[in-house]
Curated annotation (Swiss-Prot):
This is Type I iodothyronine deiodinase. Belongs to the iodothyronine deiodinase family. It is a single-pass type III membrane protein. It catalyses: 3,3',5-triiodo-L-thyronine + iodide + A + H(+) = L-thyroxine + AH2; 3,3',5'-triiodo-L-thyronine + iodide + A + H(+) = L-thyroxine + AH2; 3,3'-diiodo-L-thyronine + iodide + A + H(+) = 3,3',5'-triiodo-L-thyronine + AH2; 3,3'-diiodo-L-thyronine + iodide + A + H(+) = 3,3',5-triiodo-L-thyronine + AH2. Plays a crucial role in the metabolism of thyroid hormones (TH) and has specific roles in TH activation and inactivation by deiodination. Catalyzes the deiodination of L-thyroxine (T4) to 3,5,3'-triiodothyronine (T3) and 3,3',5'-triiodothyronine (rT3) to 3,3'-diiodothyronine (3,3'-T2) via outer-ring deiodination (ORD). Catalyzes the deiodination of T4 to rT3, T3 to 3,3'-T2, 3,5-diiodothyronine (3,5-T2) to 3-monoiodothyronine (3-T1) and 3,3'-T2 to 3-T1 via inner-ring deiodination (IRD). Catalyzes the deiodination of 3',5'-diiodothyronine (3',5'-T2) to 3'-monoiodothyronine (3'-T1) via ORD. Residues 1-12 are extracellular. Keywords: Cell membrane, Endoplasmic reticulum, Membrane, Oxidoreductase, Selenocysteine, Thyroid hormones biosynthesis, Transmembrane, Transmembrane helix. GO terms for cellular component: basolateral plasma membrane; endoplasmic reticulum membrane. PROSITE patterns: T4_DEIODINASE. Its EC number is 1.21.99.3, 1.21.99.4.
């Protein structure tokens, strides 16, 4: 059920307090116990593959935690999740998206009959999205006979003028649709093997699917068959594989 406007703002204020407290405590703990805090963050990063990512050392990203940029990004993500309109078994939001040629369309346009449609939300500056991109491509190779796939390029997770990581791709926050389309074109160098579209500048699909910084879904016949947990800590293409294998068996 859609939150009434006063209720939404009350929830936003509560989230603001939670995030501010989290960042303040994180700063204090990082100052007093830097080694322990880094160990805890590295332990969490095992879920994302960041600890195994050859393009990043922990010094490229752990020092950015609890910064002002970290605060604003986490707050944006947490606020966005208040607008989550999805649940397994529920109707999938038919949000507008834009093809790389600039044509406006909708998510449901990519559904074909009763075939499952796998949605992969992410951006080039999201290390876990890129690190696991080959896993996603293998899903396409293995299940293209029974399912369709769609990549939805959303706002940058770690824009160079936002919560930036060292040694990451240099893409600034998108100021207009052309910026977003240019960023999405970089994915073509990775041969995605499925259509790539971008979210509108209102970020409607990202908000209604609570997709920032990255997330996986499986739709079927207009409904949500699988709702992956939000990334980066819980972005798992292997869970989509299990869903598709069950459908194929």
């Amino acid at each position: 059920m859609e939150l009434p406007l006063p209720g939404l703002w009350l929830k936003r204020l509560w989230v603001l307090f939670q995030v501010a407290l989290h960042v303040a405590m994180g700063k204090v703990l990082m100052t007093l116990f830097p080694g322990r805090v880094k160990q805890d963050i590295l332990a969490m990063s095992q879920k994302t593959g960041m600890a195994k990512n050859p393009h990043f050392s922990h010094e490229n990203w752990i020092p950015t935690f609890f910064s002002a940029q970290y605060f604003w990004f986490v707050l944006k993500v947490r606020w966005q999740r208040l607008e989550d309109k999805t649940e397994e078994g529920g109707l999938a939001p038919n949000c507008p998206v834009v093809s790389l040629s600039g044509q406006r369309c909708h998510i449901w346009d990519f559904m074909q009959g009763n075939r499952p449609l796998v949605l992969n939300f992410g951006s080039c500056t999201u290390p876990s999205f890129i690190f696991k991109f080959d896993q996603f491509k293998r899903l396409i190779e293995d299940f293209s006979s029974i399912a369709d796939f769609l990549i939805i390029y959303i706002e940058e997770a770690h824009a160079s003028d936002g919560w930036a990581f060292k040694n990451n791709v240099d893409i600034k926050n998108h100021q207009n649709l052309q910026d977003r389309l240019r960023a999405a074109h970089l994915l073509l160098d990775r041969s995605p093997q499925c259509p790539v579209v971008v979210d509108t500048m209102k970020n409607q699909s990202s908000r209604l699917y609570a997709a920032l910084p990255e997330r996986l879904y499986v739709l079927q016949a207009g409904r949500i068959l699988y709702k992956g947990k939000p990334g980066p800590w819980n972005y798992h293409p292997e869970e989509v594989r299990a869903v598709l294998e069950k459908l194929h068996s």
